[in-house]
Amino acid sequence: MSGTTESQLNQLVGAMHLRHRFLGVFDKTFPGFLDPNRPASAIVNTGSRATGGMHWIAFAFDPIARKCYMFDPFGWSDRELWNLYKVKYDAFLRRTGLRQPDKCFELVRSVEAVQCPCSAACGLFSALFIASFDRYHTRPMDGNPIIDTVVGVKHSDMYKPEFQSILHRNQERMYFWFMKNNSFFRAHESELKRETAINSVPENH
């Protein structure tokens, strides 16, 4: 198989000993952030459990800043997410907003790719973002030593060989970060690298 499983991601994140509340790993029916006063995060799949899932995305909520972060390793737009995976997140974002005193919050989303389209490592990249949010909740998207392990590439460049080499290096740097900082990754290094390897996803996936 290619990619990380729900169980692997739960154990990987569990080994981080987070200071905020990690709600868990969900399929596309994720209910949202329903506690308006507590920082929280989740890893959400664009597919359903019944179909085995498709693509992992990380979400995090900062109640003080009233911001919800959406970290997609490919940085797809809403339209691209719908075209590729037939998924929308309007419902859970609406439920999150309804819990706010004035029913408002800011959605901050990634807009560049850090993962190569040939890679099955979206779950690992999502977990890296969870670690970034935990340590640097005011700037989890960039400008901190965890998320800056990887470099963003514009969508228009992500299929070009010279930029794919950057994305491939991102994956190697991410592996190195987990090796240094995560006991579950160290214990299952060979398996996780094999299942998320570069060139493990068919072209034009």
Swiss-Prot record:
Protein name stated in the entry: Protease
Listed Pfam families: Peptidase_C5
- Residue positions of the active site: H55, D72, C122
Whom does it interact with, and what assembly results?
Interacts with protease cofactor pVI-C; this interaction is necessary for protease activation.
Give compartment(s).
Virion; Host nucleus
EC number(s) recorded for this UniProt protein: 3.4.22.39
Which key words are in the record? Autocatalytic cleavage, Disulfide bond, DNA-binding, Host nucleus, Hydrolase, Late protein, Protease, Thiol protease, Virion
Query: Please, what other remarks does the record include?
Result: All late proteins expressed from the major late promoter are produced by alternative splicing and alternative polyadenylation of the same gene giving rise to non-overlapping ORFs. A leader sequence is present in the N-terminus of all these mRNAs and is recognized by the viral shutoff protein to provide expression although conventional translation via ribosome scanning from the cap has been shut off in the host cell.
Which species? Avian adenovirus 8 (strain ATCC A-2A) (FAdV-8)
Role, per record: Cleaves viral precursor proteins (pTP, pIIIa, pVI, pVII, pVIII, and pX) inside newly assembled particles giving rise to mature virions. Protease complexed to its cofactor slides along the viral DNA to specifically locate and cleave the viral precursors. Mature virions have a weakened organization compared to the unmature virions, thereby facilitating subsequent uncoating. Without maturation, the particle lacks infectivity and is unable to uncoat. Late in adenovirus infection, in the cytoplasm, may participate in the cytoskeleton destruction. Cleaves host cell cytoskeletal keratins K7 and K18.
Sorted alphabetically, the Gene Ontology cellular component annotations on this record are: host cell nucleus; virion component
- Copy out the induction comment: Expressed in the late phase of the viral replicative cycle.
Q: Which reaction does it catalyse?
A: Cleaves proteins of the adenovirus and its host cell at two consensus sites: -Yaa-Xaa-Gly-Gly-|-Xaa- and -Yaa-Xaa-Gly-Xaa-|-Gly- (in which Yaa is Met, Ile or Leu, and Xaa is any amino acid)
